UniProtKB/Swiss-Prot annotation:
Entry protein name: Probable cell division protein WhiA
InterPro entries: Homing_endonucl, Sporu_reg_WhiA_N_dom, Sporulation_regulator_WhiA, Sporulation_regulator_WhiA_C, WhiA_LAGLIDADG_dom
Top-level taxonomic group: Bacteria
Portion annotated as DNA-binding: 276-310
Keywords: Cell cycle, Cell division, DNA-binding
Annotated function: Involved in cell division and chromosome segregation.
Lineage: Bacteria, Bacillati, Bacillota, Bacilli, Bacillales
Signal peptide: none
Length: 320
């Protein structure tokens, strides 16, 4: 089962307050409901491939309203032959949709979230929970980038949902148009954690945070290793260049032509090619020399080698 499916399964088992039932149900029916007319009466079909969500809708309807509800199961005939669960509302559908602030008296759609549904903070949380159950998805934090989104068919509802997430819960949600609708999405791991907490998915939140901590630690270790590897490669490259320059000087004018301080460093570098500058400074006779001091002398040796290659005269009095 995917991380998103596990999250939704957890949400369908939550208890809901009487004041919050309407908010969650409104989101579920608004986003997954299909309105039709049969024998001069309104029918509402709510379709989902998730049995737990279908059961949740059925339970909320039975708990909050005196409407006639049927639960049907169909088999998809194309591609994946999954079950499709249909919660069908027959009698009292119009009054129900008016009460849920989805339809007006004249049967026109209300495409924004009604303030009456989300007066309390707990009801705001419940509406977001219903919206996530109806059209939400969240990436597995182990295998991909952090991403949570909720799909809406209508732009007005999508903007209203984004406003609810940002103005009341400061989630920094953003909107985007897709081919068949619109999405409100989160990209920041911290905001996704906050959203899971808001809608009551506490087990999913704990798992998300555990994975996130391990992932962040792994990334930190990788960055550190990459940094150390880069530094090591830089150090090795510098040492090889120094040895090559010292050999060139030895083959052209001889190391004995160098000033004593430079000759000593050149000879030590040839003898100890794999030691660090700090370790090289500890090998100098007559007292320890700092890393910067050793680096200064090796740069002078590099300059001498480059001048010799270019056929330019070398002034050894300026080499220290």
């Amino acid at each position: 089962m995917s991380f998103a499916s596990e999250t939704k399964k957890e949400l369908t088992n939550l208890e809901v307050k009487p004041c919050c039932l309407k908010a969650e149900l409104s989101a579920l029916l608004r986003m997954n409901g299909l309105l039709s007319f049969s024998n001069q009466q309104i029918l509402v079909d709510v379709q989902t491939e998730n049995a737990a969500i279908a059961r949740r809708i059925y339970t909320l309807l039975k708990k909050g309203y005196t409407v006639t509800v049927e639960l049907l199961v169909r088999k998809k005939m194309r591609l994946k032959k999954n079950n499709v669960y249909i919660v069908r509302i027959i009698d009292g559908a119009h009054e129900l949709l008016k009460d849920l602030k989805i339809l007006k008296e004249d049967f026109s759609l209300i495409r924004v979230i009604s303030p009456e549904l989300v007066k309390k903070k707990c009801c705001k949380r419940s509406y977001l929970r219903g919206a996530f159950l109806a059209g939400g998805s969240v990436n597995n934090p182990e295998t991909s980038s952090y991403h949570l989104e909720i799909f809406s068919l209508y732009e007005e509802h999508n903007n209203s949902l984004c406003e609810l997430m940002n103005s009341h819960f400061f989630l920094n949600a953003k909107t985007l148009e897709r081919k068949k609708g619109f999405i409100t999405y989160l990209k920041e791991a911290e905001k996704i954690s906050e959203f899971l907490n808001i809608i009551g998915a506490h087990q999913a939140l704990l798992r998300f945070e555990d994975i996130r901590i391990v992932r962040d630690m792994r990334n930190s270790v990788n960055r550190l290793v990459n940094c150390e590897t880069a530094n090591l490669n830089k150090t090795i490259g510098a040492a090889l260049r120094q040895v090559e320059n010292i050999r060139y000087i030895d083959e052209t004018i001889g190391l004995s032509a160098l000033p004593d301080k430079l000759r000593e460093i050149a000879e030590l570098r040839m003898m100890y090619q794999d030691v660090t500058l700090k370790e090289l400074g500890e090998l100098v006779s007559g007292g320890k020399i700092s890393k910067s001091g050793i680096n200064h002398r090796l740069r002078k040796i590099d300059e001498i080698a480059e001048r010799l290659r270019a056929g330019k005269p070398v002034d050894f009095h300026k080499s220290l």
